[in-house]
Amino acid sequence: MSSETTEKVVEVVDIKALLAMGDLAHGEKVFKKCSACHMIAAGGKNMIGPNLWNVIGRTAGSVSDYKYSKAMVAYAKEWTFEEMNSYLIKPQAYIKGTKMAFAGLRKEKDRASVILYMNSKGNNPKPLP
C-alpha cells in the first residue's frame, strides 16, 4: 500500500467506546443509505457495489464476482471494526481511487451503528472488542 493510493483520514479512535455508542436498529436504518448500492444478504447479488454479507473480517477487494477498482484490490486489508470506521468517515479520501461515490458518515453514532449492523449480517459475526 503506497501513500499514492491511500490518504489516511484516521484519527485515533477507541473502537470499543465508539461501538458502545452504536445501536443495531439505528444501524439498520442508516444502512438504507448504503442499500442504494449494496445488498447485505447471504447469497445476495452484487449491485453497483459488492454484497456486504460477511464484510467485517473479510479482505477488502476480495468478492470474486465483483469488479473492484485497482485501488481497492491493492488495498487488500482486512475490514476490521477500526478499518471500516476509518473508511466510512470519507471513503474517497481513505482509499484514493475507490469506486465508492458515497461521501461518508460524519456522525460517530451513525458509523458505530452501521458497523454493528454490518457485523450482525454474516455467518460468524466478529466478537466486539
What are these regions (language model features)?
Residues 78-129:
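C-terminal capping alpha-helices of c-type cytochrome domains
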Residues 2-31:
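Electrostatic cytochrome c docking/interface patches
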Residues 27, 31-40, 114-118:
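The canonical Cys-X-X-Cys-His
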Residues 36, 44, 110:
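Short phosphate-engaging motifs
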Residues 24-28, 42-81, 99-104:
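Gly/Gly-Pro-rich "capping" loops immediately C-terminal to redox-active cysteine motifs
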Residues 18-20, 36-39, 67-70:
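N-terminal post-signal-peptidase region of extra-cytosolic proteins
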